[in-house]
């Protein structure tokens, strides 16, 4: 049967960006200022939020917000590249001061970290080639259809719930 790559782009719930942080304490902020740098964990490849432009420079919405925060603090920005699954561990281990990513604040994540106010809200969508025979979620929810989503993400969770008959393939990002 025909397989397609299906990207579930956005989770329909809040996508919080840029200020996932441990409880903000005065000593942590003073440590950042004394150190002279804000260490920010970003996705190695998270287009729109964090990616390399054609000149090889890291950019994206989350990166630009992190730059602004470092500028406001008067410190150097140090971006640290991680795969998706390494973002929260980098924060919890103290390697990073914050995470800048499009991360939905799930109960499991909120039990470990604090989230900023959301920068935007997004609906869940499916993306298929223009000439695809699939025109609805119902048509994708069939045996023999393979969909893809970012592993360990709310995209994957939405895919499992909305397309239980399809095969979900999770990708790192």
Kindly give the residue locations of the regions a language model identified:
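Sec/Tat signal peptide C-region and signal peptidase I cleavage site
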Residues: 20-26
């Amino acid at each position: 049967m025909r397989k397609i790559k299906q990207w579930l782009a956005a989770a329909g719930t809040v996508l919080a960006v840029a200020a996932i942080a441990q409880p903000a304490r005065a000593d942590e902020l003073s440590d950042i200022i004394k150190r002279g740098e804000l260490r920010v964990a970003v996705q190695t490849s998270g287009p729109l939020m964090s990616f390399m432009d054609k000149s090889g420079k890291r950019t994206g919405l989350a990166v630009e917000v992190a730059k602004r925060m470092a500028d406001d603090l008067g410190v150097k920005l140090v971006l640290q590249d991680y795969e998706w699954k390494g973002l929260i561990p980098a924060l919890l281990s103290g390697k990073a001061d914050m995470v800048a990513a499009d991360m939905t604040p799930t109960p499991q994540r909120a039990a470990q970290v604090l989230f900023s106010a959301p920068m935007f809200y997004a609906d869940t969508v499916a993306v298929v080639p223009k000439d695809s025979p699939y025109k609805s979620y119902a048509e994708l929810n069939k045996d023999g259809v393979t969909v893809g989503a970012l592993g360990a993400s709310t995209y994957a969770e939405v895919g499992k719930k909305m397309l239980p008959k399809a095969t979900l393939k999770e990708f790192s990002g």
